[in-house]
Amino acid sequence: MPSYIVVGGQWGDEGKGSIIAYLALKDEPEVIARGGVGTNAGHSVFINGKRYAVRQLPTGFIQTKARLLIGAGVLVDPEVFFHELEHLKDFNVAGRVGIDHRCAIIEEKHKQLDRSNSHLHDKIGTTGSGCGPANADRVMRKAKLAKEVPELEPYLTDVAQEINDALDEGKLVLIEGTQGFGLSLYYGTYPYVTSKDTTASAIASDVGIGPTRVDDVIVVFKSFPTRVGAGPFPTEMSQEEAEKLGLVEYGTVTGRRRRVGWFDFDFARYSARINGATMIALTMLDKYDKNAFGVTDYDRLPKKAREFVEEIEGRVGVPVGLIKTGPELEHIIDRREVI
């Protein structure tokens, strides 16, 4: 698969970071690019028991041989960018990352507006990262671009050209999406959504490749979907139910407690169709069946867990190629060669 996109199929927090990190190490892509909105979405990954979280840089940073890129469609917050460069200096990120010169910049005024606007902060439940106001300025053609920020100059590049050149040379390219289908400005639970589309086609556009250059779309689903902030959640369970099941989680960016629900097969099928999914990655199967924890062989999954996977494949209509059975990178079942 010369190029593949990983996107969220629910309301974000599906565990895309752990899937991307695994693919980055297992497949050794030569280029890893991040699409999506901006710093309003955090990806986290556990490496040798230590948790790393990023909001700006690609989660594939752990593949130290890869070129890391931030596509033109992504908003850049210089403060967050440089903080992550320092935080991840052991991975030599600064020497490998490129920002598209056309990226719009999140300024302090955008963050202040995001946090003080009653509609965005109180009703919608925005993360306060400034992404919505920054995208609004971009639509109005008022936003500052990365090429206008002197301190970013050493990192500037043409991401679209780099990626298309890499594909022409037969290199493997991994493209990361952020957030999830249910938060898409067009297809999500409007108005409780993010400030742009989050589907695979939008992520491809963010980094500058056309639809014919995408070979696979991996949509990530969580065994128990979650969402942060306000908005419809048809299969939501009570906090008491979530606590009994050990499903208490907090957002990477906001620190707010996540709402938890039961797996919605109809929503998952619709999400897979709109995203053009060729494969599903299922996370937190060990939360659905605690006896699945740490299993790395599909045939060794307990009956309850295996039946759940088979039901997803049957009702969603897409094969499940990757299954996370725990938080560590090695807690995964890779079925890509047999599906």
From Swiss-Prot:
Organism the protein comes from: Thermococcus gammatolerans (strain DSM 15229 / JCM 11827 / EJ3)
An annotated GO BP: 'de novo' AMP biosynthetic process
Annotated cofactor note: Binds 1 Mg(2+) ion per subunit.
Binding sites annotated in the UniProt record for GTP: 12-18, 42-44, 258, 284-286, 324-326
Protein name: Adenylosuccinate synthetase
Required cofactor(s): Mg(2+)
Pathway the protein takes part in: Purine metabolism; AMP biosynthesis via de novo pathway; AMP from IMP: step 1/2
Entries under NCBIfam families matching the protein: PRK04293.1
Binding site for IMP: D13, E14, G15, K16, N40, A41, G42, H43, T127, R141, Q179, T194, R256
Family label: Belongs to the adenylosuccinate synthetase family.
Keywords from the UniProt entry: Cytoplasm, GTP-binding, Ligase, Magnesium, Metal-binding, Nucleotide-binding, Purine biosynthesis
Principal cellular location given in the protein's record: cytoplasm
Record GO cellular component, one term: cytoplasm
Localisation: Cytoplasm
Subunit structure and binding partners: Homodimer.
Function: Plays an important role in the de novo pathway of purine nucleotide biosynthesis. Catalyzes the first committed step in the biosynthesis of AMP from IMP.
E.C. no: 6.3.4.4
Pfam families: Adenylsucc_synt (PF00709)
Active site: D13, H43
Gene3D superfamilies membership: Adenylosuccinate Synthetase, subunit A, domain 1, Adenylosuccinate Synthetase, subunit A, domain 2, Adenylosuccinate Synthetase, subunit A, domain 3
Catalytic activity: IMP + L-aspartate + GTP = N(6)-(1,2-dicarboxyethyl)-AMP + GDP + phosphate + 2 H(+)
Amino-acid positions noted as binding Mg(2+) in the UniProt annotation, renumbered to this chain: D13, G42
One Gene Ontology term of the molecular function aspect: GTP binding
Binding-site residues, substrate: T252, V253, T254, G255, R256, R257, R258
